[in-house]
Amino acid sequence: MKQFIDFIPLILFFIVYKLEPRIVELAGHSFTFGGIFSATAVLILASLLVYGTLFLIQRRLEKGQWITLLACLVFGGMTLTFQSETFLKWKAPVVNWLFALGFAASHFIGDRPLIQRILGHAVSLPAPLWTRLNLAWVAFFVFSGCANLFVAFTFHEFWVDFKVFGSLGMTVLFLVGQGVFLARHMHEHSTESAAKSKD
């Protein structure tokens, strides 16, 4: 569920991006609404609202959420300041690669891989499987970052569509794959444990 909360600002960004730019008057001021720059402003405001609400409810944000929020503020802010969408195109690759770096670094920092620290309270697996699972997340984030970068700078007309639906689709497929992997190995692990207890 937490992964999909991150997509709320992105979906609002997509909706505004697809609007035909038009002049809107508000409180005596007129401005253009629709297109990439209006969508970027909505992305920033929606991110602040979503993560601000989560912070008030939970009294904290996870590190990944802080990274996503800060990246949105930095890259979105530069996009609006310099009126160039190039900065925003780098946001998804950089965020994904930072996540990949965090998962990879956990093999050398701390006593457990990062995915085990996240899921270890609910799932029991042998250490080698936790390592494989963690490396799968590293590979996913590296691939996702590269895919976003390639599409953003190769297919200009479709990069926003891919940013929303491509990223969401890849995430859903990967999570389903992870669920199948966990279910299969949890069953094997519980069967082995039961057999050992009988011995």
From Swiss-Prot:
Matches recorded under Pfam families: IspA
Superkingdom in the source lineage: Bacteria
Protein encoded by which gene: yciB
Native organism taxonomy: Bacteria, Pseudomonadati, Pseudomonadota, Gammaproteobacteria, Pseudomonadales
Listed name of the protein: Inner membrane-spanning protein YciB
InterPro entries attached to this UniProt entry: YciB (IPR006008)
Localisation: Cell inner membrane
Function, in words: Plays a role in cell envelope biogenesis, maintenance of cell envelope integrity and membrane homeostasis.
Alphabetized UniProt keyword annotations: Cell inner membrane, Cell membrane, Membrane, Transmembrane, Transmembrane helix
Transmembrane segments: 4-24, 36-56, 64-84, 90-110, 135-155, 162-182
Keyword Transmembrane helix: yes
Organism: Azotobacter vinelandii (strain DJ / ATCC BAA-1303)
Keyword Aminoacyl-tRNA synthetase recorded: no
GO cellular component: plasma membrane
Family that this chain belongs to: Belongs to the YciB family.
Lipid bilayer topology: Multi-pass membrane protein
